[in-house]
Amino acid sequence: MSGASDFLSKGIDLVQKAIDADTATRYEEAYKLYYNGLDYLMLAIKYEKNPKSKELVKSKFTEYLTRAEQLKDHLEKQAQNKSTAESSVNGSTKAKKSNGDGNGSGDDNDDADTKKLRGALAGAILSEKPNVKWSDIAGLDAAKEALKEAVILPVKFPQLFVGNRKPTSGILLYGPPGTGKSYLAKAVATEANSTFFSVSSSDLVSKWMGESERLVKQLFTMARENKPSIIFIDEVDALCGPRGEGESEASRRIKTELLVQMNGVGNDSQGVLVLGATNIPWQLDAAVRRRFERRIYIALPDVEARTRMFEINIGDVPCECTPHDYRTLAEMTDGYSGHDVAVVVRDALMQPIRKIQQATHFKPVIDETDGKEKLTPCSPGDEGAREMNWMDLATDELKEPPLTIKDFIKAIKNNRPTVNEADIAQHVKFTEDFGQEGN
């Protein structure tokens, strides 16, 4: 609730500034403030739990959106008039010549608009691969196999997918926060020999509200031009929530365009995969849900996956934990998401640093890596203990204490799981009704 109220207060503050600028005829400033405020109001609507409050915010959202679109039209006409005036001063015959008989200005405007839309989407194309391999993801075997079937196989063996046998065109990954949905998408981007478009609702909504549906259309056009391609939409629920009376016209248009493009009406969409991710799949519009042919539940990791997660996250940091210790830690973290385990490991990795900071005594030990004598934190009663602190040590004198299972147990006590039973129950119910297991 505090999140919704924070978004609401920020949105109201920005909208009030927009109204002040609007009244003072500073229309360009007002336009930007309106849309910044609308972004926050949209987030407030998403997280508001009280139905009456939600309806009130929605009605205000629609009112301010209408005014913002009016200002946008006014500013565009103003810019067009200015451009026309400048061209007439600089020689209108030159402009006519470039347009042939002078009737081609509409096409030029269309080209300019298309360039603008493509420019807005340019950042969505991943030119560098994220370097996340399938082996970096613990568990989720069913989800990985489904993604390989939809993404890797059709590119590597196109002869397998002919006639009525076609690869999946829409996959929805859903589950509690921190279970690895976006991480799976990164693995797809790394492993697939395809153009990867990564967008969120803000890329398609908050740039230009009035042109959002054209932005969606251009996204799919670019994907078809560069196929095989993958469109990854994170937090797809923010873009495709259920229909209702309080839904804004802009939101409705975006959703309609997305449905049309995902359906491939009038276009050849073979070779384009839409990959969606959401934490709240039950908030998806039913028609959008149907467009995602496969809906895969990314559940909390089991004990085997958590064991592997501890090993992966520790990496090459010096550690005295045995395979049995990793298993013990995995059993202690039942109910933890992949992100929760990563947080525990990050906390544990800092424990040796904290020992160094808090130590009052250090003793000499031989560093096995270079055979030199160095100093490491110890108890005052240890043999050879010297009273000193870390500030007294030279940079190359310090030998960091190794990680032990005690460091991890302490970190587990400090970091509790972030997913509750009620959230899991909703995902299980959705899976029983519409989805499939991804573990």
Swiss-Prot record:
Its main location: membrane. GO terms for molecular function: ATP binding; ATP hydrolysis activity; protein homodimerization activity. Pfam families: AAA, AAA_lid_3, MIT, Vps4_C. Induction: Expression is regulated by GCN2 and GCN4. SUPFAM superfamilies: MIT domain (SSF116846), P-loop containing nucleoside triphosphate hydrolases (SSF52540). InterPro entries: AAA+_ATPase, AAA_lid_3, ATPase_AAA_core, ATPase_AAA_CS, MIT_dom, MIT_dom_sf, MT-severing_AAA_ATPase, P-loop_NTPase. GO terms for biological process: autophagosome maturation; cellular response to lithium ion; endosomal transport; filamentous growth; filamentous growth of a population of unicellular organisms; hyphal growth; intralumenal vesicle formation; late endosome to vacuole transport. Keywords: ATP-binding, Endosome, Membrane, Nucleotide-binding, Virulence. Residues 76-113 are annotated as: Disordered. ATP binds at G175, P176, P177, G178, T179, G180, K181, S182. Changing G102S: In allele: CaO19.11814. Residues 80-93 have a biased composition (Polar residues). It is found in: Endosome membrane. GO terms for cellular component: ESCRT IV complex; plasma membrane. Residues 8-75 form the MIT domain. Disruption phenotype: Leads to defects in endocytosis. Displays a characteristic class E vacuolar morphology and multilamellar structures consistent with an aberrant prevacuolar compartment. Missorts several vacuolar proteins to the extracellular space, including carboxypeptidase (CPY), vacuolar protease A (PrA), and vacuolar protease B (PrB). In addition, certain soluble secretory proteins, such as invertase and acid phosphatase, are missorted from the pre-vacuolar compartment (PVC) to the general secretory pathway prior to exocytosis. Also results in a decrease of canonically secreted proteins. Belongs to the AAA ATPase family. PANTHER family: AAA DOMAIN-CONTAINING, VACUOLAR PROTEIN SORTING-ASSOCIATED PROTEIN 4A. Monomer or homodimer (in nucleotide-free form). Decamer, dodecamer or tetradecamer of two stacked respective homooligomeric rings (when bound to ATP); the dodecameric form seems to be predominant. This is Vacuolar protein sorting-associated protein 4. It comes from Candida albicans (strain SC5314 / ATCC MYA-2876) (Yeast). The gene is VPS4.
